[in-house]
């Protein structure tokens, strides 16, 4: 069975991973790393036919993969590969890796790992022997400092407080349109 409803894979039904995901990457980047100045994205349909909810084949007309490069203020470049065709082989369904001069961080939906540049392995390219380095070693799990509630619930609570109590709510129509 498909991992998503069939309309997601049909352009004529407003489907496609580009319209679904790039807006999310926009607010993640804007709010954590810096304002987005530009974006380049190429979409692809890697699976041309799928099976719908009733077991019938249908033609996929929407993009099921997006390869994006974002230019942020401060000279930061961000790259996102979004796919409804890729099988997961990493720590989490979503991982964000940030690399800097003094180290790296990999954040998933729940956990974050860091590696200081002093702990970064220095592999030597030799395809004739098995790789002797376990690249997962040398990473340190960031300790949990507090418990976090469900993010969607927290967002709805902020919105409802805004509607009922007129509290500030920065995620207005203009912010949504940026995506």
Model-based region annotation:
Residues 1-60:
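Predominantly a Rossmann-like dinucleotide-binding segment in NAD(P)-dependent oxidoreductases
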Residues 25-28, 155, 159, 179:
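Alpha-helical packing segments of well-folded alpha/beta enzyme cores
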Residues 40-41, 79-82:
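Short beta-strand segments
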Residues 48-54, 58-59, 67, 71-72, ...:
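C-terminal glycine/acidic-rich active-site capping loop/insertion
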Residues 64:
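Short, small/polar residue-rich loop motifs at catalytic or cofactor-binding pockets
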Residues 77-79, 104:
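Short, mixed charged/polar active-site loops
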Residues 82-89:
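Glycine-rich phosphate/pyrophosphate-binding beta-alpha loops
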């Amino acid at each position: 069975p498909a991992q998503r409803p069939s309309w997601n894979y049909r352009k004529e039904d407003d489907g496609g991973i580009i319209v679904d995901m790039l807006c999310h990457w926009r607010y993640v980047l804007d709010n954590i790393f810096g304002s987005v100045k530009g974006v380049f994205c190429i979409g692809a349909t890697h699976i041309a036919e799928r099976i719908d909810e009733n077991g019938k084949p249908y033609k996929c007309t929407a993009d099921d993969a997006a390869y994006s490069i974002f230019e942020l203020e401060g000279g930061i470049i961000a790259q996102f590969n979004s796919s409804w065709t890729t099988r997961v082989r990493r720590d989490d369904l979503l991982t964000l890796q940030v690399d800097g001069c003094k180290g790296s961080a990999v954040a998933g939906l729940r956990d974050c790992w860091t590696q200081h540049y002093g702990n970064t392995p220095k592999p030597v390219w030799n395809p004739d022997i098995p790789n002797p380095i376990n690249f997962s070693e040398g990473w340190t799990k960031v300790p949990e400092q507090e418990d976090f509630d469900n993010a969607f619930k927290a967002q709805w609570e902020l919105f409802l407080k805004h509607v009922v109590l007129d509290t500030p709510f920065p995620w207005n129509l203009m912010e949504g349109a940026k995506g």
